[in-house]
Amino acid sequence: FVNLPELMRIYKETADIQTSDMLDLPVPEAKIIAVESELTQAQKYYLEELVKRSDAIKSGSVDPSRDNMLKITGEARKLAIDMRLIDPAYNLSDNQKILQVVDNVERIYREGAGDKATQMIFSDIGTPKSKGEGFDVYNELKDLLVDRGIPKEEIAFVHDANTDEKKNLLSRKVNSGEVRILMASTEKGGTGLNVQSRMKAVHHLDVPWRPSDVGRILRTFKIKKNVEVTDNGKIII
């Protein structure tokens, strides 16, 4: 950035900036607990290939139109979540994170049954597809959670609420506990969606590009109890 101090000085002439710390806003307490996912053999092998490709790109021996660091970064993000995002021929056993997320979501679901506590799962990768269009993370998570005994009616995708009326209805269902697990991307669920009334946990499967997108339910006035948030397979309590 150039002339940033000057820009901020001009901005402050017309803006009144108040942070949550300055206002002493009530927010729930949070403690971060890292839950690591071990690489499977399939992930290790593919990661080694990405390193080799990266070295080739740095040496200039590869045409950027055929392979480049942006492509490698995208594949690495997919690898970290589920290998089937790279190639549907891989199996569930070639991944650990998905099952860890399912374990955490089910645990919190059972623990919060009395209060109808709700949860959100954020993933910007592997968003829902129509049947027959290939593998996606959202439907895989839903199927695995249903296999654990969670009613499918209590699981929803924010992507299905494609009108204001449907979004308002979805918000009411989540706030009432009728829907207890909501999956969303950062774009569709990060702001402007008021579903915090019973929210107990938020799980981030991938790392958002902006740090401010992590821990959304900590920035609401409506939460009065401690919460759990997961970031990239890590649980934050």
Please place each PLM-identified region on the residue numbering.
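Conserved helicase motor "Helicase C" RecA-like lobe of SF1/SF2 P-loop NTPases
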Residues: G126-F157
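Short, solvent-exposed loop/turn segments at secondary-structure junctions
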Residues: D16, A42-K44, K52, K78-I86, ...
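Short, high-confidence coil segments that cap the C-terminus of an alpha-helix
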Residues: G114-K116, E178-V179
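Conserved RecA-like ASCE P-loop NTPase motor core of nucleic-acid helicases/translocases
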Residues: A117-I125
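Inter-lobe coupling linker of SF2 helicases/translocases
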Residues: F1-N91, R107, I237
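Conserved helicase ATPase core of P-loop NTP-dependent helicases/translocases
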Residues: P151-T186
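SF2 helicase/translocase ATPase core recognition
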Residues: L23-V51, T186-I237
